């Protein structure tokens, strides 16, 4: 006859069974948690692994714009450099729509829009096959407009980031804001057009884990160039071009063009 516990009025065999069951449940819990965590980690790793470098469209117009745009931006900056040194605010303000038109043309003709399959954007028509809708459709135009809106929204945050890194706050506010607008238009607009609001893609971009291409290379080059452009400002050279933010803007444009060219050619597909 099994012994009965006078307090719980249950047999010792039942108590031992309950204890053994709870122990086995406790032991199995860490394993299940480890399985869930490993599944989550594998899912995030797979999402990063599927992020591929952006391929430029292979149409003749895309290849022409791809190579002509860096020369056009360089010519624009060199032609307006003296005026930029003399009066930076109106020069940056007047150049902003021109740069926006350049970037919009580059995105529409050269880059695949967010959500567009890469195979569809890069597929060449077969002999005798007519391409439907042309290269630019209503969806790509809407994507470009949304990318412009997102770039405008991010510009104030980029302005405050520049202030945190030492930009003038009480003075030269318009100078800094227009410089931030140029930097956002150069580096962030193509990324918004390509990736949209994909959280996994932006996590890879923000963590510098994305593969290098023209869009991500332009971002890295623009940031590094703007940072290096701040070096000559405090130096005692007494040059007119040391005014804020001439060297910052010069470094941003030069770094963006260099990073974009290298990211699209020599370092395409590589990671940090």
Swiss-Prot record:
Bias (Polar residues): 21-31
Where do the TM regions start and end?
91-111, 145-165, 177-197, 215-235, 248-268
- Give the family per the record: Belongs to the PIGF family.
Q: Name one GO molecular function term.
A: mannose-ethanolamine phosphotransferase activity
> What is the name of this protein?
Glycosylphosphatidylinositol anchor biosynthesis protein 11
Tell me the compartments it is located in: Endoplasmic reticulum membrane
Cite the entry's keywords alphabetically. Answer: Endoplasmic reticulum, GPI-anchor biosynthesis, Membrane, Transmembrane, Transmembrane helix
Report the pathway entry.
Answer: Glycolipid biosynthesis; glycosylphosphatidylinositol-anchor biosynthesis
Q: Does the keyword Cell inner membrane apply?
A: no
User: What membrane topology is annotated for this entry?
Assistant: Multi-pass membrane protein
Q: Which InterPro entries does the annotation name? A: GPI_biosynthesis_protein_Pig-F
GO CC annotation, single: endoplasmic reticulum membrane
Instruction: Name the gene.
Output: gpi-11
Q: Where is this region: Disordered?
A: 21-48
Q: What does this protein do?
A: Acts in the GPI biosynthetic pathway between GlcNAc-PI synthesis and GPI transfer to protein.
**Composition bias type Low complexity, residue spans:** 32-48
Q: Which Pfam families match?
A: PIG-F
UniProt entry tagged with the keyword Ligase: no
Q: Give start-end ranges for the coiled-coil region(s).
A: none
- Where mainly found? endoplasmic reticulum
GO BP, one annotated term: GPI anchor biosynthetic process
């Amino acid at each position: 006859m099994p012994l009965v516990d006078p307090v719980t009025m249950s047999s010792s065999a039942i108590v031992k069974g309950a204890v053994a069951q709870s122990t086995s449940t406790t032991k199995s819990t860490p394993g299940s948690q480890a399985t869930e965590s490993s599944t989550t980690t594998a899912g995030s790793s797979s999402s990063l692994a599927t992020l591929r470098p952006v391929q430029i469209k292979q149409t003749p117009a895309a290849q022409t714009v791809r190579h002509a745009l860096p020369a056009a931006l360089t010519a624009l900056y060199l032609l307006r450099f003296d005026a930029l040194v003399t009066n930076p605010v109106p020069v940056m303000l007047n150049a902003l729509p021109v740069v926006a038109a350049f970037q919009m043309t580059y995105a529409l003709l050269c880059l695949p829009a967010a959500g567009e399959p890469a195979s569809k954007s890069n597929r060449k028509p077969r002999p005798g096959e007519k391409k439907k809708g042309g290269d630019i459709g209503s969806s790509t135009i809407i994507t470009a407009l949304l990318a412009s809106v997102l770039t405008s929204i991010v510009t104030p945050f980029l302005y405050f980031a520049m202030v945190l890194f030492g930009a003038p706050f009480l003075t030269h506010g318009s100078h800094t804001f227009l410089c931030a607008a140029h930097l956002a238009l150069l580096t962030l607009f193509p990324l918004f057009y390509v990736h949209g609001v994909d959280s996994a893609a932006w996590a890879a971009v923000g963590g510098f884990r994305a593969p290098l291409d023209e869009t991500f290379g332009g971002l890295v080059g623009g940031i590094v160039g703007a940072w290096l452009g701040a070096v000559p400002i405090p130096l005692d050279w007494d040059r007119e071009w040391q005014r804020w933010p001439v060297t910052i803007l010069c470094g941003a444009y030069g770094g963006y063009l260099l990073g974009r060219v290298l990211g699209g050619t020599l370092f395409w597909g590589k990671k940090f």
